[in-house]
Design a protein with these regions (language model features):
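Terminal, basic amphipathic appendages of nucleotide-handling enzymes
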Residues: 2-66
């Protein structure tokens, strides 16, 4: 398992932009991979922007939710 940061696709900008969001995954992802990431509004297009994110960089209040 590893932590990755993703950015969601923004149709208005026709780009993957905005804040990075952290997810835990067992998939062998690399930077630049395009994925479908779960959100409360359903799965959304996203791009992996960072892999192997250290737990120390994730807010401790969020870690149990990942």
């Amino acid at each position: 398992m590893m932590l990755v940061n993703i950015r969601y696709y923004k149709p208005l900008h026709k780009a993957y932009a905005g804040n990075a969001f952290t997810y835990r995954t067992a998939m062998p992802l690399t930077v630049g991979d395009k994925v479908m990431a779960p959100t409360k509004g359903g799965d959304k297009r996203a791009m992996v922007v960072e892999i192997n994110v250290p737990e120390s960089r994730v807010d401790e209040r969020i870690m149990p939710l990942l």
